[in-house]
Amino acid sequence: MASLKEVKTRINSVQSTRKITSAMKMVASAKLHKAQGAIENMLPYQRKLNKILTNFLSADLPVESPFCVERPVKRVAIVAFSSNSSLCGAFNANVLKMFLQTVGEYRELGQDNILIYPVGKKIEEAVKKLGFFPQGSYQKLADKPSYDEAAALAKLLMELFLEKNIDRVELIYHHFKSMGVQELLRERYLPIDLSAVQNDEERGGVVNDYIIEPSAAQLIADLIPQVLSQKIFTAALDSNASEHAARTLAMQIATDNANELIQELTKQYNKTRQQAITNELLDIVGGSMA
């Protein structure tokens, strides 16, 4: 059985850890509140913008967009979103798992034809360990999502796609649903996927309600870059909010575990102390009878 001093030292150590996890939980909770507000304000706009675009592109109009062109995939770009720091449960591990699965599907293209754009320190480090060369560092975008940085990344991807330097772009990120639920998504970014609206009863309905000037082609040309830039920004906001939610939950669980451990150690301390007192009394009684 451990001595009183050893048990007391363990109790103090766990109490110190509990203070840290509790403080980290409060910080993460505050950041989550801010990030949640940003994503909740942005999502309706992004979804509406995307719906307008898909309605235009899928309507019976004599318009074609180069961003919708399907071609054989010879070169692919993968944009994966993670966090810059750890202590957020399985958040980064899940991103890495899906990233490895995605890379595995394109392995036959050859490593030189798989371009990786890591948004976040953790996925960037993992990419380097796997032997890939990251196409830039976007840690700031993961920590504090900025529309300007997101738009710059989107512009780069669009240019590469138009120049046929890449044939497909995929996104891997967490979608924030609630404090306890963050859904890991893998989405095709380019070419634009219209399959989701093929069976939409309202397909093309929005277009018929508008007079398009100067032309549908010009409107789509102006709208697509905005939608694609907004998509990267929204994914960054989604990932950021999901990270803080995962960290808040992880620190809450760690704090609860610390409380349980302190209770168990306190019981052990009291039991050990009681046993020590009993032994001393027995020694005293035994000495007086000798």
Swiss-Prot record:
GO molecular function: ATP binding; proton-transporting ATP synthase activity, rotational mechanism
Endpoints of the signal sequence: none
Lineage top rank: taxon: Bacteria
Keywords, alphabetical: ATP synthesis, Cell inner membrane, Cell membrane, CF(1), Hydrogen ion transport, Ion transport, Membrane, Transport
Gene Ontology BP term (one): proton motive force-driven plasma membrane ATP synthesis
Membrane topology: Peripheral membrane protein
A Gene Ontology cellular-component term: plasma membrane
Any Pfam family the entry gives: ATP-synt
Keyword match Cell inner membrane: yes
Compartmental location: Cell inner membrane
Family: Belongs to the ATPase gamma chain family.
Quaternary data: F-type ATPases have 2 components, CF(1) - the catalytic core - and CF(0) - the membrane proton channel. CF(1) has five subunits: alpha(3), beta(3), gamma(1), delta(1), epsilon(1). CF(0) has three main subunits: a, b and c.
NCBIfam families, per the entry: ATPsyn_F1gamma, PRK13426.1
Biological role stated in the UniProt entry: Produces ATP from ADP in the presence of a proton gradient across the membrane. The gamma chain is believed to be important in regulating ATPase activity and the flow of protons through the CF(0) complex.
Protein name: ATP synthase gamma chain
Organism per entry: Bacteroides fragilis (strain ATCC 25285 / DSM 2151 / CCUG 4856 / JCM 11019 / LMG 10263 / NCTC 9343 / Onslow / VPI 2553 / EN-2)
Recorded name of the encoding gene: atpG
